Structure formats: C-alpha cells, structure tokens
C-alpha cells in the first residue's frame, strides 16, 4: 500500500517535527542564557555572618539565651548580625519577612560601617496584633544596587513561630 500525496499523517508528522525542533531551540536558548548569567567559574564572594537568632527583651533592648530556631507566638526574637566581615563599598540591609512575606523588621539600608552599631534586628508583631503570626520567618541580609533594589542575598536564617 502506497502513501498518497494528500495523506494527513504526513502533515501531522511534519507538524510534530516542527514543534519538537522549536522546543529544542527554546531549551538551547534557555541553557545558553543560564550559562551566560550564572557562570560556573564564579561564585558569590560576599557572605554576611548571622551570629544567631535569640530571645529578645524589648525593655532592655538585649538578646538572651541560646541560638534558637523555634519560638512561641508570645516570644519576642531578634537576629544578631556581624557586619565586620563585609567591605564598606556596598550597601546592605537586614530584613525580617513573615509567612506572608510582609516585612516585620529591618535595619538599613546603609554601608556595613554605618550599620556597625545596629547589630540587633528585631522581628516585630504585625500592627494591631499582640503576638507574632505562626509560621516561617525568614531573616535575610541583602546587598542593594545603587537604586536601592536587592540584588543578592548574602546571609539568611529561617525560624519558626509555633502555634
């Protein structure tokens, strides 16, 4: 049995080949873009040191106890940052995010030397609430560009507020 010139299978086959070639082209372009913007030979050279996350006394404005990863809703907590390991030619800020990605505490932006006296970054309960919302809280130290936009996370900690 011979295949005629008007066979619909040939058109479908060629269409599938065209879609496959287009898919491979998109994949190659994506890999090329990834290699260009994320070269394998370089890695992030800046790393900020988060000393720890501790219970916080708002009256005395001090941290206490051991470094922890879990807190109760009614406990105040804060991160302690060591700014001394960062060069002074960058702009940084330290930010607390709650489970809804709301900013619940921050220090900066500024150069590390300007922030040297602000080593304690507290996580505040949301406005109108007495306690922290339960869930995951992320503390991030970010490097900012000249426009004040975060371009790199150079330090990070995650803590959990339990119900």
Task: Give the role of each language-model region.
Residues 1-13:
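N-terminal Lys/Arg-rich, disordered targeting/topogenic segments
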Residues 15-33:
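Hydrophobic membrane-insertion alpha-helices, especially the h-region
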Residues 34-76, 162-163:
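Short, compositionally biased P/S/T/A/G/V-rich stretches that sit at domain boundaries
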Residues 76-84:
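Short edge beta-strand/loop segments characteristic of extracellular beta-sandwich folds
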Residues 83, 149-163:
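Short beta-strand elements
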Residues 94-98, 141-143:
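Conserved aromatic beta-strand anchor motif in extracellular beta-sandwich/beta-rich domains
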Residues 104-117, 155-158:
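Solvent-exposed serine/threonine-rich low-complexity stretches and specific carbohydrate-binding patches
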Residues 112-147:
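Short, solvent-exposed, Trp/other aromatic-anchored flexible loops in extracytoplasmic proteins
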């Amino acid at each position: 049995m011979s295949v005629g010139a008007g066979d619909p299978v040939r058109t479908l086959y060629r269409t599938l080949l065209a879609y496959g070639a287009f898919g491979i082209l998109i994949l190659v372009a994506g890999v090329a873009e990834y290699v260009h913007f994320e070269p394998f030979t370089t890695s992030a050279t800046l790393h900020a040191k988060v000393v720890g996350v501790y219970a916080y006394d708002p009256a005395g404005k001090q941290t206490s106890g051991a470094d922890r990863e879990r807190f109760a809703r009614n406990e105040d907590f804060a991160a302690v940052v060591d700014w001394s390991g960062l060069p002074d030619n960058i702009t940084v800020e330290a930010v607390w995010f709650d489970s809804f990605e709301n900013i619940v505490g921050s220090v900066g932006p500024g150069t590390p030397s300007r922030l040297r006296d602000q080593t304690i970054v507290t996580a505040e309960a949301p406005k109108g609430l007495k306690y922290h919302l339960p869930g995951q809280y992320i503390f991030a130290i970010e490097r900012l560009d000249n426009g004040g936009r975060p371009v790199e996370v150079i330090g990070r900690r995650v803590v959990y507020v339990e119900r």
